[in-house]
Amino acid sequence: PQGGRGYHVLAALISETRLCYGPWNGTEQDVALAEQWLPSGRTVAERFDGDRVPAVAELLRRYLTSHGPATLRDFAWWTKLSLGEIRRALPLIVDDLEADGAAEPAYWRPGLLDEVAALGRASSAPLLLPGFDEFVLGYQDRTFAMTEAEHQRIVPGNNGVFKKTVVQGAQ
């Protein structure tokens, strides 16, 4: 499809669980048939006996593991869940997480403190990120990494299309 409709078709098929993002092929992420790629078995509702709190806790744990360090507000923005629901779920996984020790908003991630200690300083080697990379897309507040002018260049018109990005020294 032309004119950006391909993204809409892909999003619709993913939201209907017909397709899903599959393995990385070395240059980009493949799209796969959901029934062939996703594990079969119990549904999320069955796994958590219909209790949303542990289901939200598991989703929060996975988000912070893959996207962290991030705030609870980042997760709320990403999932569109309420902060109240997220705060009720946090105690179920808090022992598996570490926070940056700052006042609100705290940034959470499993193994965060060890990771920061091991890294010491941020790498000065540039990172070449594809469009729609989670470094930019995964956070509601992106000012930790860019100015408003840079944001306009990466997300022109704030229209939901994210261009390729070069990151150096966390900026």
Regions found by a protein language model. Name each.
Residues 1-136, 140-142, 148-171:
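Long, low-complexity intrinsically disordered regions
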